[in-house]
Amino acid sequence: MPSFDVVSELNLMEVENAFNQARKEILQRFDFKGTSTDLERDKDENVVVKAGSEGRAEAALQVLMEKLAKRGVPLEGLDPQKLEPASGGSVRQLVKLKRGLKQEDAKRIVALMKESGLKVQAAIQGEAVRISGKKKDDLQAAMQAIRTGGLGVPLQFQNFRE
């Protein structure tokens, strides 16, 4: 019985490359000269934006998002938190990277498959959802339904088996 897995993963190598490009641009750009604006990675591989003002922090975040988009990293995989005041009158913002398919998102995918009326079965398996059906055409229709479902998380299809 043909099947595939629906997962939510970010290409961490591309995230690292985009992070380095954004950091380099912030260090070299004229409007950031003389400011304490910087990007850092924390121990959980999330991104921390540090800046002297809210406007600079937003601009630095925009540079990071621009570089991520150019490298093909889906921006739905980012979860920017609120700006927090930091020491010395500066601000910092944590940008969490969404990894793995959360339980509620997996349940929404299963519900979407049931609502679609396709002859497929969906089963939650940890941080993935396995979709199986009798025909390849049903699985391709399921992929299309998931893509157009508007779930708000970056999804990939893996392990397509016959």
UniProtKB/Swiss-Prot annotation:
- Pfam families associated with the record: DUF520
Q: Which InterPro entries match?
A: DUF520, UPF0234-like_C, UPF0234_N, YajQ-like_sf
Keywords (alphabetical) are: Nucleotide-binding
Task: Give GO terms: molecular function aspect only.
Answer: nucleotide binding
- Gene Ontology CC terms, in alphabetical order: cytosol
Relate the protein's function as given in its record. Answer: Nucleotide-binding protein.
NCBIfam families for this protein = PRK05412.1
Family membership noted in the UniProt record: Belongs to the YajQ family.
The name of this protein is: Nucleotide-binding protein Anae109_0095
